[in-house]
Structure formats: C-alpha cells, structure tokens
C-alpha cells in the first residue's frame, strides 16, 4: 500500500508522532531481544496449496500494521497483539524497514541511515530494538509476522532513500551494485536477529516492488537472486515477494493490473524455487477498476497459484468506505478459492496510549461494527470449515 498523508486523520497522526518521538517513563519501555523459539516444529511451512501454522493446516486470517514497529510504548505493542490473539487473527504484516537520509533529531524511530554513499543500521533503542519488541510480543501472543525489507514507495524512505544516498534511479535499484550491497547488508542485519524465532511467518523482499517500463527479467532476476540470498542466511523461514500480483494471463480481461507494464510477471516470478508462496493485493479505486472486479482478480490468482503448486496469500486489500459491504465478498471469494490459504486486510487500527493508531483511510478499528463483520464473522466462517 502507498500511504496517502491527506487521508491520515489528525488523531492518528498525533498518535503516531507521539509514539515514535516521545520516550516513555515507565519500565514497560524496556526492549528485550526476542528469545529463540522453543520448538523447531513450530516454524511456519507450506503443505501443497496450504499454509501450516503451529501444526494446523488450512486457511488463516490476519492484517497489516505498518506503524507498530515505530511505537515506543511497549504497552501499546502488547495491547495490539493481545487484541489480535483474542480476535483469532493469526498473521500480522509489518514494515521491517524505516530508511532515512538524515538522522532524526526529535527522537523518532528509524532503522537504516543512508547518506553519502554509506549505509548504517540503527540497532539502538530508537532503531531495531523497537522491532525486537514487536517480535518478542508476537512470540508471547502466538502471532506470526511477515517482515519486509524495503518499500517501493517513498513512505518511510523506500527505494528513493537508496537513490538519494547512492545515485542512480528508482528503476535502477534492482541492478545497481552499491544499492544492492546496502540492501543485502540490511537484510542480513534483520534476519540475524530473528532467524531462530518462530514468530516469523515469512521474509518479504519488498512492499509492492515495481519496475515501470522494464523488461520483466529485471524484477525476475532480482527476485531470484535476493530470495536465494535470504535462503542462504535462513533456510527455516518462508520467503515471498510482497508484490501486487501484476502481470497475469490467467483470467485476464486486459485491464491495467493484468498487464505487464509495471515490469512484473506473476506466474513466472512465482515459479522461482526460492519463493515459497504467492502474494497479491487489491485496490480497485487506485487501479481504475470496480469493486466487483476484485472477485475475479482473487480467483485468477488462486488459479495461477494452483498451477504453480504453491499457496497464495491475499496480502493486502482495502477501501476507504463501506468496508463490510465491499470487502466481505472479497473475503468470501478468497476463502472459497483453491490455493488461496489466507488473507490480510489493510489495515488494523486500535486505540493506543496517545490516541487512535494511524488511519490512512483504509483503516478500521478493533471493536467496531466493521471489525465484527470483517474479523469476528470472518474468523467464524474460517473455523466452521475445519
């Protein structure tokens, strides 16, 4: 998802800014590194067209929270994971990147400083120790995390943060030696912290990687080599791309998302041996399609994943209004489509110590009517199939 600052509520912005900038006085801000998981058997795996979590094979629901790793109040993090656990949501996708070109002077959390041709990983209390606590809390609450390493969009730095530090272009990121060396060094720094944690559902190459106007071989080669590198560092966890699902002949109606103009070939990329499952997103209002069109998008990706012999994760989907009416049919379609083994709505909202968590327009909050429709009732539908 590309964040739209104009849609963030004032309350959500205040909450996010306070959480990331202000140190908390209580002892709850101590940030322990996550301890290694107890049993190797609890690592997430795949079985045919399904995910296997904690020994259970089937369909799993979850959400996205780009902001949780930037909170400085541990109680807020624990509150979110407690509510996820209570609701039956099993997977949370979080931003594993926070790239800056200048070190913040206000105490804001950042993970990775890119400046003047150099890259420095921030392992301090205002850096990856915040992600440490997210992983630790996820372990305690039985939630699985998808952690990605860079953003195609400019939110929290993204690829353009690398471009500003090393030169070149956004499209050139995938083949530029200096940028790729910094990117891989960051991947290694993150994976080395959590390679033994069973809280990790999967490592994800990027949020919505695109290469507009490029031959599809550019992204393919980058995905292949990067996923191989990740597997060389950690063979225990799944690896995925984080793409939107663009570039697909199966079920194509010729509309923009099915085309190859963003440099992506969904089926070809999915066939890479070191990619364990497919990811796809759905934002009709951003893509010039209708809400009803989304159901065909879901089934087309299910068919492509079935052909590849790998499960699909419906990884992001959202609208800015009528959440229940619009998103419920997508959930039902995904739940009843072979090879789709989970969905994560965009995005989770909760009441934090500083106010509501950020609302980019697609957010709905814990305990609301939309939450009952799209989480409580959805989990009940999933459980009724078991």
UniProtKB/Swiss-Prot annotation:
Instruction: Please tell me one Gene Ontology term that the record gives under cellular component.
Output: extracellular region
Q: Which UniProt keywords apply?
A: Carbohydrate metabolism, Glycoprotein, Glycosidase, Hydrolase, Secreted, Signal
| EC class of the enzyme, as a word | hydrolase
Q: SUPFAM superfamilies per the record?
A: (Trans)glycosidases (SSF51445)
Asked if Acetylation is a keyword of the record, the answer is no
- Amino-acid biosynthesis among keywords: no
Return the EC number. Answer: 3.2.1.78
Q: Which reaction does it catalyse?
A: Random hydrolysis of (1->4)-beta-D-mannosidic linkages in mannans, galactomannans and glucomannans
Q: Where is the active site?
A: 208 (proton donor), 316 (nucleophile)
Q: What is its main location?
A: secreted
- Identify the Gene3D superfamilies for this entry: Glycosidases
Gene Ontology MF term list: mannan endo-1,4-beta-mannosidase activity
InterPro entries documented for this protein:
Glyco_hydro_5 (IPR001547), Glycoside_hydrolase_SF (IPR017853), MAN-like (IPR045053)
Where does the record place it? Secreted
PANTHER family named among the record's database cross-references: MANNAN ENDO-1,4-BETA-MANNOSIDASE 1 (PTHR31451:SF39), PTHR31451
Q: Which family does it belong to?
A: Belongs to the glycosyl hydrolase 5 (cellulase A) family.
What is this protein's name? Probable mannan endo-1,4-beta-mannosidase A
């Amino acid at each position: 998802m590309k964040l739209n600052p104009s849609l963030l509520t004032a309350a959500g912005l205040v909450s996010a800014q306070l959480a990331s900038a202000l140190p908390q006085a209580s002892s709850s801000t101590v940030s322990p590194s996550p301890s290694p998981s107890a049993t190797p058997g609890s690592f997430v795996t795949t079985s045919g067209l399904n995910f296997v979590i904690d020994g259970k094979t089937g369909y799993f629901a979850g959400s996205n929270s780009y902001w949780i790793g930037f909170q400085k109040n541990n109680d807020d993090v624990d509150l979110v994971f407690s509510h996820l656990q209570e609701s039956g949501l099993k997977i949370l996708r979080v931003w594993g990147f926070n790239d800056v070109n200048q070190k913040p002077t206000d105490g804001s959390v950042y993970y990775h400083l890119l400046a003047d041709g150099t890259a420095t990983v921030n392992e301090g209390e205002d850096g990856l120790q915040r992600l440490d606590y997210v992983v630790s809390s996820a372990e305690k609450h039985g939630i699985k995390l998808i952690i990605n390493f860079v953003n195609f969009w400019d939110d929290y730095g993204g690829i353009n943060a690398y471009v500003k530090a090393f030169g070149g272009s956004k499209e050139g990121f995938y083949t530029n030696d200096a940028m790729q060396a910094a990117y891989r060094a960051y991947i290694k720094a993150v994976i080395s912290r959590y390679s033994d944690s069973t809280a990790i559902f999967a490592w994800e190459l990027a949020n919505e990687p695109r290469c507009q106007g490029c031959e599809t071989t550019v992204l393919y080669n980058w995905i292949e080599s990067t996923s191989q590198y990740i597997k060389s560092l950690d063979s225990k966890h799944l690896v995925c791309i984080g793409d939107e699902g663009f570039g697909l002949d199966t079920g194509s109606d010729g509309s923009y998302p099915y085309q190859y103009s963003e440099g992506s070939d969904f089926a070809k990329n999915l066939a890479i041996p070191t990619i364990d499952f497919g990811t796809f997103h759905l934002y009709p209002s951003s893509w010039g399609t209708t809400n009803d069109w989304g159901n065909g998008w879901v089934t087309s990706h299910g068919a492509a994943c079935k052909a590849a012999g790998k499960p699909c994760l419906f990884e992001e989907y959202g609208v800015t209004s009528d959440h229940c009416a619009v998103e419920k049919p997508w959930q039902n379609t995904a739940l009843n489509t072979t090879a789709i083994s989970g969905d994560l709505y965009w995005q989770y909202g909760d009441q934090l110590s500083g106010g509501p968590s950020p609302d980019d327009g697609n957010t709905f909050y814990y305990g609301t009517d939309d939450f009952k429709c799209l989480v409580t009732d959805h989990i009940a539908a999933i459980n009724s199939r078991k």
